[in-house]
């Protein structure tokens, strides 16, 4: 049973790394969008704090 769970986790890790390498060019856009959203959130917090 433990071996089956280990094999399942290993297969999941391999599929995740495969998807990551396949969508590597989209990672930069995703990271840029996250940074933009984070800066917008910080600006909103400052705006609420100033009022």
Curated annotation (Swiss-Prot):
Effect of residue 30 to R: Decreased proteolysis of His3-(20-43)-peptide by C.albicans SAP2 and SAP9. Increased antifungal activity of His3-(20-43)-peptide against C.albicans
Listed name of the protein: Histatin-3
Function: Histatins are cationic and histidine-rich peptides mainly found in the saliva of higher primates. They are considered to be major precursors of the protective proteinaceous structure on tooth surfaces (enamel pellicle). Hsts can be divided into two major groups according to their biological functions: antimicrobial Hsts (e.g. Hst 5/HTN3) and cell-activating Hsts (e.g. Hst 1/HTN1, Hst 2/HTN1 and Hst 3/HTN3).
Any one annotated GO CC term: mitochondrion
PANTHER family found in the cross-reference section: HISTATIN-3, STATHERIN
More about this protein: The recommended nomenclature of salivary peptides follows published guidelines. In agreement with the authors, it has been decided to indicate the boundaries of the peptides according to the positions within the precursor, and not in the mature protein, as has formerly been proposed.
Important for candidacidal activity (site feature) positions: 32, 41
Annotated organism of origin: Homo sapiens (Human)
Signal peptide segment: 1-19
Motif (HExxH motif): 34-38
Lineage: Eukaryota, Metazoa, Chordata, Craniata, Vertebrata
């Amino acid at each position: 049973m433990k071996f089956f769970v280990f094999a399942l986790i290993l297969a999941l890790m391999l599929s995740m790394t495969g998807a990551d390498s396949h969508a590597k060019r989209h990672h930069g856009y995703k990271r840029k969008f996250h940074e933009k959203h984070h800066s917008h959130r910080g600006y909103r917090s400052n705006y609420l704090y100033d009022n």
